[in-house]
Every structure is written in structure tokens, then in C-alpha cells.
Swiss-Prot record:
Pfam families: CDC50 (PF03381). This is Cell cycle control protein 50A. The gene is Tmem30a. GO terms for biological process: aminophospholipid transport; phospholipid translocation; positive regulation of neuron projection development; positive regulation of phospholipid translocation; positive regulation of protein exit from endoplasmic reticulum; protein localization to endosome; xenobiotic transmembrane transport. It is a multi-pass membrane protein. Keywords: Acetylation, Cell membrane, Cell projection, Cytoplasmic vesicle, Disulfide bond, Glycoprotein, Golgi apparatus, Lipid transport, Membrane, Transmembrane, Transmembrane helix, Transport. It comes from Rattus norvegicus.
Length: 328
């Protein structure tokens, strides 16, 4: 059911101006738009229209949520390409001042922003009378532990075999090729950044982040790019390395004993945080993350429960003398 209203049902009225000229007035024109007499349509929500909506939402969302949740939990570790993540807990990257503490123009290679960073980067804008590159709290707090994975092939030969960890291909394509660029010019990166200084908490300048690959230095370093994409929740994981499967005959990580070598550079005790390393594969919906499935199941269950409650109320009071139907 719906109520309809039309401006045609009302006759425009009101005094007209004096003959021979237009009278000066601050009153709006006597039109349907300015006098708020446009046609309107307003739905009347009744049990007959609302209850099916709640049940339909519940019947759609609950199966979708169950499917996503089961798919997420069924991701089998160590099959196919394996993704290595580092995880942090109790780290609030979604804080407003933290999120804004960056200069996107500087990160995009703008020479003027390189030497004169945005004031949003304060108090990590300048140090030792030099501009900080990259500036801001996000860059200053970049994760810098080093993780190395080794396989002990057999107990008789305990010499560990290092697992090849790929550094390239861990950042989003749009970030790598659009949002982050080094300053233009043919000079070396060290020359381009000579008038800047490193962030306060960094052990080395931005042009020396990857000593093994010169093309992975500066603002286009993929570890740096991954860190600069802030997380929405205080417990999060970020992609660290990729372990590629070489062929279909051999598993990516064969059965055996492994050990993880960690070069500890990133303290977490001062914010009561925790660090972890995750090895995982991906499915059609990405990596293991049960949140989306739980959200769908929760919304679907609430909608279905509300539908049942309203159905009971409608059945109990539909014969009431006050109304023949419940209007919501």
C-alpha cells in the first residue's frame, strides 16, 4: 500500500501583484517546487510487506555466510602457492591522526613535496633541519623484522635448506604503478634523496631498503607499499613474502621439519602488542578470514529472528479491534 499526493489536487492561490508592475517581495515564487507541493509517494509498511522481506534477507544471507565461513576454514595450508604474512595485534592503524600522517604527493615522487612535506606529517615532518622522506607516522612505524624460513631435509644431515621467499609481487598493482613513484630524473636514488633524511625509527634510508634489488628501493619498495596500506582493525596481517610452487610434481613446502629465523628489529612491548607469522594459501575469496562469513550469518540470523517475532506479534494482534493490520 502507498499514499499518493499530487500538486494537481491543490489549486494554487494567493494574492497577485499590483497591475502595471511587479511588486518587490522576498516570498518564493508560487510554484509546486518552491512551495513544496511536488507529487510524493510514501510506502505504508505493513506486516504483509515487511515480514517477507525479513525472511528473504535471512534465507539469502545465512547460506551465503555459511558458504563463505566454510570456504575460509577449509583453506588447506602449504598447498599451491604459499603466502607468508606477518601479523600484529593491538596496533591501531585506523586512528584518525595516524591515517592522515602521510604525504601522498611526496610518495608519488613530487620533487617539491619531497623537500617540503605536508604539515599532516608532523611531528615526523623534519629532522635535523632536513625533510623526512618518507614523512609521517605511518612510514615511521614501518615493520622491519626480517623473516627467513629453512627446511631441515633429514635428521642425518641437519644442514638447513633455505626456502626461496619472493619479494616482488606482494603489493597491489595500482599502488606499485600509480600511487607510489620515485622522484623523476636520471640520477641515482641516493642523489635524489640527498637533501632528505630517513624517518626517526628507521635504521637505513629509503633508497637502501632492499640491498639485493636496486629496482625495489625508494618509494616503490614493495614492503614499504604494503605497510602504507593501513588496516581497519587493531589485529591484522600483511603480506610479507610469496613462496611459489615450482611444479605440479613436488609440493611447495614438503613434509619435514622447518625452523624460522627472525631478526628482531620491531619492538611491540611498548603498545602491549604481539607479533606472529602466518603461512597460508588462498581460495576464490582470498586468504583465510572468517569475518565476512560471520557477518553474513549474523545479519541473516537477526533478520530471520525479527521476521519470526513480527509474525508472532501480527498473528496475536491481527484480530484486535483497534486495527486489522499492524502498521510499522
Amino acid at each position: 500500500m502507498a499514499m499518493n499526493y499530487s500538486a494537481k489536487d491543490e489549486v494554487d492561490g494567493g494574492p497577485t501583484g499590483p497591475p502595471g508592475g511587479a511588486a518587490k517581495t522576498r516570498r518564493p515564487d508560487n510554484t509546486a517546487f518552491k512551495q513544496q507541493r511536488l507529487p510524493a509517494w510514501q510506502p505504508i509498511l505493513t506486516a504483509g510487506t515487511v515480514l517477507p522481506t525479513f525472511f528473504i534477507i535471512g534465507l539469502i544471507f545465512i547460506p551465503i555466510g555459511i558458504g563463505i565461513f566454510v570456504t575460509s576454514n577449509n583453506i588447506r595450508e602449504i598447498e599451491g602457492n604459499v603466502f607468508m604474512y606477518y601479523g600484529l595485534s593491538n596496533f591501531y592503524q585506523n586512528h584518525r591522526r595516524y591515517v592522515k600522517s602521510r604525504d601522498d604527493s611526496q610518495l608519488n615522487g613530487d620533487p617539491s613535496a619531497l623537500l617540503n612535506p605536508s604539515k599532516e606529517c608532523e611531528p615526523y615532518r623534519r629532522n635535523e633541519d632536513k625533510p623526512i622522506a618518507p614523512c609521517g607516522a605511518i612510514a615511521n612505524s614501518m615493520f622491519n623484522d626480517t623473516l627467513e624460513l629453512f627446511l631441515v631435509a633429514n635428521e642425518s644431515d641437519p644442514k638447513p635448506v633455505p626456502i626461496l621467499l619472493k619479494k616482488k609481487g606482494i603489493a597491489w598493482w595500482t599502488d606499485k604503478n600509480v600511487k607510489f613513484r620515485n622522484p623523476p630524473g636520471k640520477d641515482s636514488l641516493q642523489e635524489k634523496f640527498k637533501d632528505t633524511t630517513k624517518p626517526v625509527n628507521w635504521h637505513k634510508p629509503v633508497y637502501e631498503l632492499d640491498p639485493d634489488d636496486e629496482s625495489n628501493n625508494g618509494f616503490i619498495n614493495e614492503d614499504f607499499i604494503v605497510w602504507m596500506r593501513t588496516a581497519a582493525l587493531p589485529t591484522f596481517r600483511k603480506l610479507y613474502r610469496l613462496i611459489e610452487r615450482t611444479d605440479d610434481l613436488h609440493p611447495t613446502l614438503p613434509a619435514g621439519q622447518y625452523y624460522l629465523n627472525i631478526t628482531y628489529n620491531y619492538p611491540v612491548h611498548f603498545f602491549d602488542g604481539r607479533k606472529r607469522m602466518i603461512l597460508s594459501t588462498i581460495s576464490w575469496m582470498g586468504g583465510k578470514n572468517p569475518f565476512l562469513g560471520i557477518a553474513y550469518i549474523t545479519i541473516g540470523s537477526i533478520s530471520f529472528l525479527l521476521g519470526v517475532v513480527l509474525l508472532v506479534i501480527n498473528h496475536k494482534y491481527r484480530n484486535s479491534s483497534n486495527t486489522a493490520d499492524i502498521t510499522i
